């Protein structure tokens, strides 16, 4: 994911704020709970904790903010018993690697706490039958369109391409559809899927199908038909996300995939949140997006710091509560994961719109599959490499699709044992 390199040096580059409660701590006990988060979540968590600091009696909460999601992940990968946090707010695909490395600790939730969430959300944070955190917010993308360029929601992928070609010269378009949020791996999966390539396959009962990949011929031919002009790109879909957001906001791209963390930027510029999944090549079908949750994850460092009890209470009292998620999402502006927060009147139409798009075309983000490189490369590297090979380097769309299908099939099979 763009979803965004420090070791100990990263902590120096980060900023932190500790907020004290009014409850006197037990003498001699460790009383500071340390939470690590990225450049968006960190400042917002800090503000919420500053406004109400008594989520866990007798403890202070220190939020350490890193410059990006990638910087946070790198720091956590390098964390030691001395430097690591008690809780880290990270992606669900961190769970398999964190559990295997011994840096994440399992947590048991009461039935009452579990009832606050959709059961499938816990699957995102589970590894080998053990839960490692609580769902905080829903992560997904959706497509919007510029109503000054196109008047209605497209029913098919081909309709978007036709509109682009008819408007390209007169409107000075720089692209037809581009990825403004989530990058060319995570954010662009819905384009892969709309054209026939899903990272993994599901049966009619919602179970993963092993040993099978997407049809390289179907996908490759769709790429040729909709994205190519001979051996060159027709300009509709760029192989990079660079400049996409600025170009869409400037009115030179009619369709854009945006992230649910950035919708306010578009509203501020007057755009309607006409959110929808990327339409497929046939009407009524949609490209599937990753619709996962971010989690507040308990670490094994907490027990070593003597703050495990407090960290667990912060997870349930704040991160998993209606009050906590409502307060947090008023600032973070992502769709909340907790049911009570989802129903709260403070949740915006845009937040609900992303939730609806995820319900219509979301698939779980399975880190065990996507992080595997048994096929020669992991999903995150192989996905953008395909667009570069075909749209920039002019390689054959079907032949490259065959290579990609093989990589993803092997990776899914290899990841089966980590579920």
Task: Pin down the residues of each PLM region.
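Short, solvent-exposed loop/beta-turn-alpha elements that line the ligand-binding surface or hinge
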Residues: 109-117, 177, 198-222, 268, ...
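Glycine-centered hinge/linker elements that transmit conformational signals in sensory
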Residues: 164, 207-238
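Long, aromatic- and glycine/proline-rich binding clefts that accommodate carbohydrate-like moieties
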Residues: 329-382, 387-389, 415-419
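Short amphipathic alpha-helical coupling segments at ligand-binding clamshell hinges
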Residues: 47-48, 87, 156, 218-223, ...
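Conserved N-terminal structural module of periplasmic/extracytoplasmic solute-binding proteins
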Residues: 2, 9-94, 399, 407-419
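Hinge/lid segment of periplasmic solute-binding proteins
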Residues: 92-140, 152, 159-161, 276
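Extracytoplasmic/periplasmic solute-binding protein
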Residues: 132-136, 141, 161-211, 253
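Extracytoplasmic/periplasmic substrate-recognition and gating elements
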Residues: 267-333
């Amino acid at each position: 994911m763009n979803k965004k390199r420090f070791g100990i040096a990263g902590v120096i580059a980060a900023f932190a704020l500790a907020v004290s409660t009014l409850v006197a701590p037990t003498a001699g006990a460790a009383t500071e709970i340390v939470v690590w988060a990225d450049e968006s979540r960190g400042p917002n968590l800090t503000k919420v904790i500053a406004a109400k600091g008594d989520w866990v009696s007798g403890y202070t909460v220190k939020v350490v903010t890193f410059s990006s999601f990638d910087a946070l992940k790198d720091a956590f990968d390098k964390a030691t018993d001395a430097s690591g946090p008690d809780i880290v707010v990270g992606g669900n695909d961190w769970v398999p690697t964190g559990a295997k490395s011994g840096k994440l600790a399992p947590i048991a939730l009461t039935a009452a706490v579990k009832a606050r969430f959709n059961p499938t959300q816990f699957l995102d944070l589970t590894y080998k039958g053990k839960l490692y955190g609580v769902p905080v917010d829903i992560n997904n993308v959706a497509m919007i369109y510029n109503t000054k360029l196109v008047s209605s929601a497209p029913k098919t992928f081909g309709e978007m391409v036709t509109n682009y070609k008819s408007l390209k010269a007169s409107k000075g378009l720089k692209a037809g559809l581009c990825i403004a949020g989530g990058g060319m791996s995570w954010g662009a999966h819905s384009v892969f899927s709309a054209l026939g390539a899903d990272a993994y396959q599901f049966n009619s009962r919602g179970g993963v199908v092993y040993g099978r990949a997407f049809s390289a011929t179907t996908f490759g031919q769709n790429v040729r038909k909709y994205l190519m002009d001979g051996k060159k790109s027709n300009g509709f879909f760029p192989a990079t996300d660079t400049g996409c957001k600025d170009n869409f906001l400037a009115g030179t791209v009619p369709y854009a995939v945006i992230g649910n963390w950035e919708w306010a930027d578009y509203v501020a510029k007057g755009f309607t949140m006409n959110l929808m999944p990327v339409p497929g090549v046939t009407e009524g079908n949609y490209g599937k997006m990753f619709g996962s949750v971010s989690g507040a994850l308990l670490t094994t460092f907490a027990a070593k710091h003597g703050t495990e009890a407090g960290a667990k209470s912060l997870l349930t009292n704040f991160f998993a509560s209606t009050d906590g998620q409502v307060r947090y999402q008023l600032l973070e502006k992502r769709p909340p994961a907790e049911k009570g927060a989802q129903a709260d009147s403070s949740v915006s139409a845009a937040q609900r719109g992303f939730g609806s798009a995820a319900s219509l075309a979301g698939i779980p983000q399975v880190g065990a599959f996507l992080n595997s490189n048994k096929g020669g490369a992991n999903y995150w590297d192989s996905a953008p490499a395909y667009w570069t090979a075909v749209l920039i380097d002019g390689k054959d769309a079907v032949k490259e699709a065959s290579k990609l299908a093989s990589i993803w099939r092997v990776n899914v099979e290899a990841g089966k044992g980590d579920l």
